[in-house]
Design a protein with these regions (language model features):
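General beta-strand structural signal in soluble alpha/beta enzymes
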Residues: 19, 42-45, 84, 100-101, ...
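N-terminal Rossmann-fold NAD(P) dinucleotide-binding loop
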Residues: 26-27
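Adenosine-phosphate binding glycine-rich loop
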Residues: 117-184
Length: 184
């Protein structure tokens, strides 16, 4: 997030973000985007996605997915004004400024990338491992979409693994905030 922010200023502030997935990568991408001032409006699982125009209730999603091991559809059943769509591939048709694919490999194909561009997306930053097909990447580049490939976007995860090994070898326990500060 820091390298992107240096190039674009406050890239996340007041931006609408679409996220796929609801596992660790998606949850923490949602948390970071929200901390940086964005409004995350979607999360998904393999059965479908939820659209919350007021912004995702991350505390609920964390409880739903990490504690109760529920399905994302339950979010729509408990939150007023939320839409559930029983097709996770359609998450990329939701208008957004920033797309964070955090679910699975090859989840954004050419048609999905074209839908993102048509609906105003200007930034795609990959959280999942290779979520965009080569055809999708061509669409981003041809349309001036700022594209953060998984290799670059996940560098923080690799660095965090190194920090975790250091922490373990010294028998220390760092808070989330301490790890985040060390990454910066």
């Amino acid at each position: 997030d820091r390298s992107v922010s240096r190039g674009l200023g406050d890239v996340y502030k007041r931006q609408t973000v679409v996220i796929s997935g609801s596992g660790n990568v998606a949850i923490y991408a949602c948390e970071k985007a929200t901390q940086l001032g964005a409004k995350v409006v979607t999360m998904s699982d393999s059965n479908g996605y939820v659209y919350d125009p007021n912004g995702i209730d991350l505390a609920y999603v964390k409880d739903l997915k990490e504690v109760r091991r529920g399905r994302i559809k339950e979010y729509a059943e408990t939150h007023e004004g939320v839409t559930y769509v029983a097709d996770c591939t359609k998450v990329w048709t939701v208008p957004c400024d920033i797309a964070l694919p955090c679910a699975t490999q090859n989840e954004i194909n050419k048609e999905s990338a074209e839908a993102l561009v048509k609906n105003g997306c200007t930034v795609v930053c990959e959280g999942a491992n290779m979520p965009s097909t080569p055809d999708a990447i061509e669409v981003y580049l041809a349309n001036g979409v700022l594209y953060g490939p998984a290799k670059a976007a996940n560098a923080g995860g690799v660095a965090t693994s190194g920090l975790e090994m250091s922490q373990n070898s010294e028998r220390l326990s760092w808070t989330f905030e301490e790890v985040d500060a060390k990454l910066k």
